[in-house]
Amino acid sequence: MSNHSAIETISTAEISPIKRASTLSANPELIYAAGAWAVSGVITLLWPNTQEFERTTDLAVLQWIFAALLLVVHVFRGQLAGLFRKLHYNAWRLVALAVLLSIWQVASAKLGLWPQPYFPPPQGVLDAYIKDYVRLADSIRASLILLFFGVGLGALAGFLTGLSTGWSPRVGYWTIPFLRLFGPVPATALIPIVLFVFPTSFSGGAFLVALATWFPVAVLTWSGVSSVDSSYYDVARTLGAKERFLLLKVAIPATLPHLFVGLFMALGGAISVLVVAEMLGVKAGLGFYLDWAQGWAAYGHLYGALIVMAVLFSGVTTLLFFVRDRVLVGQSGGVQW
C-alpha cells in the first residue's frame, strides 16, 4: 500500500461515524446515570417510610426499568447511535435528576422532614397520575384548545396591527398612541370585566389569551416593518415593483424574524394568562385542575399537574422554534431555545 493510500485510509477512519461512536462509548457517563437511577430505586423501596404511601413499589420498579433501559442503550449503542448520543450528552443531567428525586423521597417519605400532605413524596404524584389520568387528560386538552385558539387570534390581530402600523403612516397615526397607552396593561387586570361581558368562560378566556398575545406581536411586527432598509424598496421599485409586491415580497419576509421573537415573548404571557383565567373563571383546563386540587388538599395531584404544565408548555415553545427554524431557513442568530 502506498503512503498516499495509507493516509487516505486513516483519514477515512478518523471521520467515520462508527469510529466516533466507539470513541464516545469509551466514556461511561450513561452507566453512571443507570447506576444513579438503580440506587434511587433501592432507596425508594428498601428504606422504610415514616407512614404508608401507595405506589412505593411501583415507583421503585419504574426507576429500575429506566435504569435498565439506559444500560440497554449503552450496550446496543451501535444500533441505537442517535438515541445513545442524545442520552450520553444528557447523562449527567439524568444523574442529577435521580439525585434530586432521591432527596425528595428521603425528605418527604423516609425522614418526614417535609410536612404531609403538603409535600407528598414522588409516589404520591405517581398515584395521582394513575388514579386521575382521565381528568388530567381532559384538562390538558381543554388548556391546549384554549391556548392555541387564543394565541392564534392574538397573533393574527397583532400581525395585522403591526404590519399596518409600520407600513402606513396614516394608520400608525392612530394605532401608535393606542399601543403605547393600552398595550402595557396586563390582560389579567381585565378578568372581572371580561367574565361579566363575555357570554361564556371559554370566549372570555380566549379573549384574554389573545389580548396577551396581541401586544408583543404587534410591537415586534411594527418594529420589523419599520427597520427594513429603504434600499430594498428602491431596488424593487427600480425593477417596476408595485406597492402590493413591496408589501408581500419585501416587507413581510423581512419582518418574519421579528414576528417570531414577538410570538416567543407573547407565548409566555399567554400561558400565564391562560392559567390565571382557568383558575378564576374557566371551568376546565390545567389552571382549573390546580385550583380543584388545592381546594381538596390533593397535593399529589397539584404537583403532578405542575410537572405536566412544565413539560407541556415547554413542548409548545419548542414547537414554535421548530416552526421558526423551518420558515427562516438559513437565518442564524436571534432568540435561542
Residues of each region from the PLM?
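Short cytoplasmic-facing helical segments at TM-TM junctions of multi-pass membrane proteins
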Residues: 173-177, 217-262, 286, 290
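Hydrophobic alpha-helical transmembrane segments of multipass integral membrane proteins
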Residues: 100, 137, 141, 145-165, ...
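C-terminal transmembrane helix and the adjacent membrane-cytosol boundary/short C-terminal tail
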Residues: 226, 257, 261, 303-337
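Transmembrane alpha-helical segments of polytopic membrane transport and secretion proteins
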Residues: 1-95, 321-337
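Transmembrane alpha-helices
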Residues: 207-211, 244-277, 304, 309, ...
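Generic hydrophobic transmembrane alpha-helix motif, especially the helices
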Residues: 179-216, 223-224
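Periplasmic/extracellular loop-to-transmembrane helix junction in inner-membrane transport proteins
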Residues: 49-58, 78, 82, 86, ...
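Transmembrane-helix boundary motif in ABC transporter permease subunits
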Residues: 76-83, 149-179
